[in-house]
A protein has these predicted regions:
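Patatin-like phospholipase
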Residues: 2-46, 54-211
Length: 211
């Protein structure tokens, strides 16, 4: 299921919304783009969109969907066992180590060498701002940035990167269209996982007290 040859970089920016397992829809769209060798030059991933976007950059069709479908009842991947062992409802160590090296090998080489700009979106908890980290400019482990982007408040522990702590990019910027426009991007394709009439609610008092 590896995408082979014939790719032409498109003047296209993809914005991938999060949404936990709703990202299966995003996976399907990205698989179709890969099938027809449509290679966007910019890919912004928020939360689960960042996890899904990694497989678009590594050119691995169906990998994202298989991991989520085949492991949705795997307690090491998601659930109380992951929470107890890793401090979060998603077992990121298990995902990036065991699963990505054995059951579902991740093509690190293709990912690393890709000329596409892959930008996970994260929330800086100290400063309360959104940060955009491009993989080739990242001074830290890009997989840690992806983990931070998809670490949901209350369900995950904060991820330390440098001197700051980070959480899900969707906390401050769920759909970074304005950022893309300000950066001069002209052709933007946004993959949404929520209903069209959805509106983000105000931050709860519980969330304010915790963070």
């Amino acid at each position: 299921n590896q995408m082979k040859g014939g790719n032409k970089m498109q003047d296209l920016t993809l914005i991938l919304e999060g949404g936990a397992l709703r990202s299966l829809y995003t996976s399907g769209v990205l698989d179709v783009l890969m099938k027809y060798n449509i290679e966007a030059n910019y890919v912004l991933g928020v939360s689960a969109g960042a996890l899904t976007g990694m497989n678009y950059i590594s050119k691995q069709k169906e990998r994202s969907a298989k991991i989520n479908i085949e492991n949705c009842d795997n307690p090491r991947y998601i659930g109380m066992k992951a929470l107890k062992k890793e401090g979060g409802i998603i077992g990121y160590d298990y995902l990036f180590d065991d699963l990505s090296k054995n059951a579902y090998p991740f093509d690190y080489e293709t990912f690393k060498l890709s000329k596409q700009k892959f930008i996970p979106v994260i929330t800086n908890c100290e400063k309360g701002i959104t940060e955009y980290v491009e993989k080739n400019d990242c001074k830290e482990d890009i997989f840690k940035v992806v983990q931070a982007s998809s670490s949901m408040p209350l369900c995950s522990k904060m991820v330390k990167i440098g001197n700051n702590h980070y959480l899900d990019g969707a906390v401050t910027m769920p759909i970074p269209v304005d950022w893309a426009i300000k950066e001069g991007h002209k052709k933007i394709l946004v993959l949404l996982t929520k209903d069209r009439d959805y509106r983000k609610p105000e931050i709860s008092n519980t969330m304010k007290k915790v963070y």
